[in-house]
Swiss-Prot record:
Belongs to the NAD synthetase family. Its EC number is 6.3.1.5. It comes from Coprothermobacter proteolyticus (strain ATCC 35245 / DSM 5265 / OCM 4 / BT). GO terms for molecular function: ATP binding; glutaminase activity; metal ion binding; NAD+ synthase (glutamine-hydrolyzing) activity; NAD+ synthase activity. This is NH(3)-dependent NAD(+) synthetase. SUPFAM superfamilies: Adenine nucleotide alpha hydrolases-like.
């Protein structure tokens, strides 16, 4: 990556050009209270001005209250107009909450504890972190396994439909907040948080986004939060992956530089290297879907 200042200027120019090229009136962004959307919001304001940005906060029943508080605070600090729209009524209407009856548990702490208990059991039986095994056939029946996957993914897809509705209603471009680390290993929901019109940080590893956040003076409360999709209580990014972003990014950067698996195994645990390499290959295959016939 360039210096933080150079990269910021490069992205801001990119955002201005995209708006002119697409002949749109501004940008719409979903703001979660997390690091990636905070960085992108800061870049948008500096690139095109707060009057050309609209923020949406889209919590649901499982969203941590602090996430919404931090998202509101950042948008108000940047003087960006925004709306808060609860996804709970639609998800309830679809019957999503019945599939994972967390509402029966009285406190968030208890919900997090139960979710992690199931997650740890899955990891033990699958012999790898659940993220790296979610596309495989489980060796044994796992309670709530597929329901949990569907529960997680539908939230991203409902959010995406909502974001696009408001983007098109205002003749805005929808800006995405997926980073390069997530893209390379498929740590996103297809037809969910990967979908957007402009992806200004998709070329930056998570650790590089973190560097930009310091340069852009993203509030410390956001910078210090563990990265989390905030869709199921108790599950953070690194808990789901079973690996921290510093290690993940070093492995991914090593692959980008042409290092072999054996080279990387001299520096990192062999099982982690294998998981990451296999996941990168699988993600490349996943991006080729849907399957289609060629013309006869």
């Amino acid at each position: 990556m360039n210096t933080a200042m150079e990269e910021t200027q490069r992205i801001e120019q990119f955002l201005r050009k995209a708006l002119v090229s697409e002949r749109k009136h501004g940008y719409l962004i979903g703001v979660s209270g997390g690091l990636d959307s905070a960085v992108v919001l800061k870049l948008l304001v500096q690139a095109v001005g707060k009057e050309n940005v609209l923020g949406l906060i889209l919590p649901d029943r499982d969203t941590e209250k602090k996430s919404t508080t931090l998202a509101r605070s950042l948008l108000e600090q940047e003087k960006v107009p925004y709306k808060v729209i609860s996804m709970t009524p639609l998800l309830r209407h679809l019957g999503v909450y019945k599939d994972m009856p967390l509402f029966l548990l009285p406190t968030r702490g208890l919900k997090e504890s139960i979710v992690r208990r199931f997650y740890n059991d899955y990891t033990k039986k699958l012999n790898k972190p659940v993220f790296f095994a979610q596309w495989e056939e489980p060796p044994t029946q796992l309670p709530y396994f597929y329901e949990g996957i569907a529960y997680y993914r539908i939230k991203h897809r409902v959010r995406m439909a909502t974001l696009y509705y408001y983007a098109e209603k205002n003749d805005y471009l929808l800006v995405g907040c997926t980073n390069l680390s997530e893209r390379l290993i498929g740590f996103y929901v297809k037809y969910g948080d990967d979908v957007c019109d402009v992806a200004p940080i998709a070329h930056l590893y998570k650790t590089e986004v973190r560097q930009l956040s310091e340069y852009l003076s993203v509030p410390e409360d956001i910078r210090n939060r563990p990265p989390s999709p905030d869709l199921i209580p108790g599950i953070t990014d690194e808990y789901s992956l079973g690996i921290n972003y510093e290690t993940l990014d070093q492995i991914l950067a090593g692959l980008e530089e042409g290092k072999t698996a054996e080279d990387l195994k001299q520096l990192f645990p062999a099982d982690i290297v294998e998981l990451v390499i296999n996941q990168v290959k699988f993600t490349q295959k996943l991006e080729g879907k849907p399957y289609m016939l060629k013309r006869a």
